[in-house]
């Protein structure tokens, strides 16, 4: 299963990947908006959107891509791992 994590804290990016790996998932983590963001997202099985730490522009792009390619988006307010 492939997961895209959007938002969160820069320092927690490797922790997010470790958690996904422990559940047998391959993860991409985007804490900031890179160039060609739409292409880098790809078509994952799930997108996790940390709403408290993500920019409006990134959230809109993820939602548009999810609607187009029909993958679910889990919206979580907190970016904590507890």
Task: Describe each PLM feature range.
Residues 1-24:
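Short, charged N-terminal beta->alpha structural module
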Residues 44:
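An anion/phosphate-binding loop that grips the pyrophosphate of nucleotide cofactors and donors
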Residues 52-53:
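Short glycine-/small-residue-rich Rossmann-like dinucleotide-binding loops
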Residues 6-8, 32, 78:
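Cofactor-binding loop segments of dinucleotide-utilizing enzymes, especially the Rossmann-like FAD-
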Residues 23-40:
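A short, well-structured beta->alpha microelement
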Residues 66-82:
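Ser/Thr/Gly-rich flexible loops in soluble cytosolic domains mediating phosphotransfer, phosphorylation
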Residues 16-19, 39-40, 61-62:
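A short acidic, amphipathic alpha-helical/loop segment
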């Amino acid at each position: 299963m492939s997961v895209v994590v959007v938002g969160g804290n820069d320092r927690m990016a490797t922790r997010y990947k470790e958690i996904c790996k422990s559940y047998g998932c391959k993860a991409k983590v985007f804490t900031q908006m890179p160039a060609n963001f739409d292409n880098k997202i790809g078509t994952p099985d799930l997108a996790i959107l940390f709403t408290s730490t993500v920019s409006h522009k990134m959230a809109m792009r993820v939602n548009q891509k999810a609607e187009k390619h029909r993958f679910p988006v889990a919206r979580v307010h907190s970016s904590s791992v507890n």
